[in-house]
Amino acid sequence: MAMRVSKSIVGVDVAKAELVIYLADPDLLTSITNEKPAIKRWLKTLPGPTAIAVEATNIYHVDLVELAYESGHDVYIIDGFQLSNYRKGVGGRSKTDASDARLLGRFLKNEGEDLRPWTPPPAVYGKLQSLLRRRASLIQAKTSLTQSWANDTSLKAVFATFVKSIDRLDLLVQKKLKEVLREAGLLEEVARCQAIEGIGFLTATALVMAYNRGDFTSGDSYIAFLGMDLRVSDSGQKNGRRYLTKRGCSEVRRLLHNAAMSACRSNAWKEFYNHHLNCGKATTQVLVMLSRKLARIAFALMKNQSEYQPKGAVIA
């Protein structure tokens, strides 16, 4: 649905060194360097409140988004996968910086009514997300190195010492996570989520972090924010395969998958897990189903400020 509010519409294609800018009125293309001083000068030239569409590009869009928001403009961060499909849907035959900037402006003009403007996340969200991502990179590197050195015995003792140093760094990251949570007054929320079978400290931290990013009205919106809502492709009598949208932070989904692998062995969820396996579902499908259930339970606990009641317990 086209935007109803009369605002100037701008599409910006972001690269590391350059911003290619399309102004819908007066149908003008321009470019500036992707540096704060240049961005500030350009923002001052805009005619009043403006709606700006930007494709998320690594971290290169962050300065533009934050400065535009501070200047009073509405900023819309567009998912790259969604924009790519939109290009195909409207018959786009080329992909250049200029065409992407035009496409972003067109997308915002036609679909803006259904989009939500970007708002800055709470400070604690950025800190927790940064620490969780750094830890994920650390563990990924450790796993890769351990596998590649598995058959090399000549430096086994030295490598073992190296792995222990990685483990110590991991513990320091987790300690820092607890400090951030304590300063933000969120340790109680983490403990509330940890009461759920399979959910440990890291998964609980990720769930609390995600919950504090937005004002979620329902479990469905929370699941969608985690990128665990389903993409449906049905037509006539044919029911297509379901896929996760996988939007948002991939580390939260990875931690939830690990939590589901642990929960499926617990008394509370073993029956659920085996039932769906016996119905013919694949292991990954069942683990995704269980991950979604765990996330929904965590959301309900945080939303209602209630305590977890294990399956079979009497709820007062």
Model-based region annotation:
Residues S6-V14:
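Two-metal-ion RNase H-like nuclease active-site motif
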Residues D13, I21, I52, D79, ...:
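Mobile genetic element proteins and their domesticated derivatives, centered on retroelements
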Residues R116-Q129, N151, G240-L244, E271-V288:
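Short, solvent-exposed helix-loop connector elements
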Residues F201, A206-T283, I315:
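Phosphate-backbone recognition surface of nucleic-acid-processing proteins
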